[in-house]
Amino acid sequence: MEAFNLHKKAVSRDYIVKPRLEYRTVSAVNGPLIILQNVKSPRFAEIVNVTLGDGSVRRGQVLEINQDKAVVQIFEGTTGIDNKKTVCQFTGEILKTPVSLDMLGRVFNGSGKPIDGGPPILPEAYLDIQGQPINPQSRTYPEEMFETGISSIDVMNSIARGQKIPLFSGAGLPHNEVAAQICRQVCLVSTCTLVKRSGKDEEDFAIVFAAMGVNMETARFFRQDFEENGAMERVTLFLNLANDPTIERIITPRLALTFAEYLAYEKGKHVLVILTDMSAYADALREVSAAREEVPGRRGYPGYMYTDLATIYERAGRVEGRPGSITQLPILTMPNDDITHPIPDLTGYITEEQIYLDRQLHNRQIYPPINVLPSLSRLMKSAIGEGMTRKDHSDVSNQLYAAYAMGKDALAMRAVVGVEALSQEDLLYLEFHDKFERRFVNQGAYERRDIYTSLDMAWDLLRIFPVQMLRRIPEKILQEYYHRTSNYEHKENKPHSSRS
């Protein structure tokens, strides 16, 4: 009788008014995946609305098609799904997210639904969460330096607007505090002076924060920090917490980046996107791969993880003819502090910069515990120098790197032969090593140093050495800056002009 009623319903249905097909053919549930049989013309990446027996609705996406079978991943998890009462409706649409300027100042879950108790969003458009690939020919080379107010970043690993800057961290390290400090203090070098004088932030600056698998404490920390600093009205949060479905973490960064692209390329805003924790995202990717019984790659992660991560990281940048930009700050915790782990390893290949947080510096009460030696910025050279920061910037950075590396060698030598066997030069390098970490790298969480102050502090440290030992700095630069008592009084106020 039930079959007769279903057949009667199908025959009498008005497919013009209600064209979507519905199925009750769930044959298997495997982790975050369900398998449907006898499906008519399913499409890859098609969105499926899954209605459970209790009336709740979940969303899924077609991952794999084999004749009349379809493998669907459920974003909200498969708990409670059975093969009798579950109804699956194929929408014929890809996954899109509503976007609107009203989303600024709001909090959403990992699926893009409001969770702050505010009114529903009135969308201005629905955009594909996969975004549109940027033509390399239309990309604008990043040439405007972001001043973070952190000396070890601004002087030695300068950030350009439109860059990807992952924070390589570990469990228990203050990566959240460093990311929050960057958000509080970041501005263009060319506009920082104007911002200080007016006391106002850039009106066209916005922050999109996406959390994947973080605990409630981390989410509360960022939200409270934004609110206390009066920045919440230009911040949008997408929160997938540790107790939320794992599979949801795959779409959370894409929702955040889609909204960021809307702000940058449609509304002309300069957007900073914070993604934490990318390790949780990669683990979710591994879980889906294992459920699909794919051949695993290194440490069980899928072989296509490099490509998948690139679809996220490469959505940063600037587009010619568009006034906005997207700068990414992904945070990833390295398992066992292993930088050769597949997640940081592949991330380092894709991104143009990496900031490495060191546990030994953290144990010595140095904040931020940024180890400058494994850190790097591949786009730094185009964003610094005369007319942009100061003409001695590049040479000072090179000399700091060289002196700090020599200090590390002297430290290792002292542990073997003792301090009595060290030469006078080695003792100078040891002194520089200690003062570099205690004075230059170490600074307060709410201490902001502009680029000129940081460069002056670097010169104060380099004066530990006689002029003949500063071999990385040209003679002309040494004559101009080495004997100055206060370089900050002679700063070159020739900022790089902002570009639309």
From Swiss-Prot:
It comes from the Eukaryota. PROSITE patterns: ATPASE_ALPHA_BETA (PS00152). InterPro entries: ATP-synt_VA_C, ATPase_a/bsu_AS, ATPase_F1/V1/A1_a/bsu_N, ATPase_F1/V1/A1_a/bsu_nucl-bd, ATPase_V1-cplx_bsu, P-loop_NTPase, V-ATPase_su_B/beta. One of its GO terms (molecular function) is ATP binding. The keyword Transport applies. Transmembrane segments: none annotated. One of its GO terms (cellular component) is proton-transporting V-type ATPase, V1 domain. SUPFAM superfamilies: P-loop containing nucleoside triphosphate hydrolases (SSF52540). Keywords: Hydrogen ion transport, Ion transport, Transport. One of its GO terms (biological process) is vacuolar acidification. V-ATPase is a heteromultimeric enzyme composed of a peripheral catalytic V1 complex (main components: subunits A, B, C, D, E, and F) attached to an integral membrane V0 proton pore complex (main component: the proteolipid protein). Belongs to the ATPase alpha/beta chains family. Non-catalytic subunit of the peripheral V1 complex of vacuolar ATPase. V-ATPase is responsible for acidifying a variety of intracellular compartments in eukaryotic cells. PANTHER family: V-TYPE PROTON ATPASE SUBUNIT B (PTHR43389:SF4). This is V-type proton ATPase subunit B. It comes from Cyanidium caldarium.
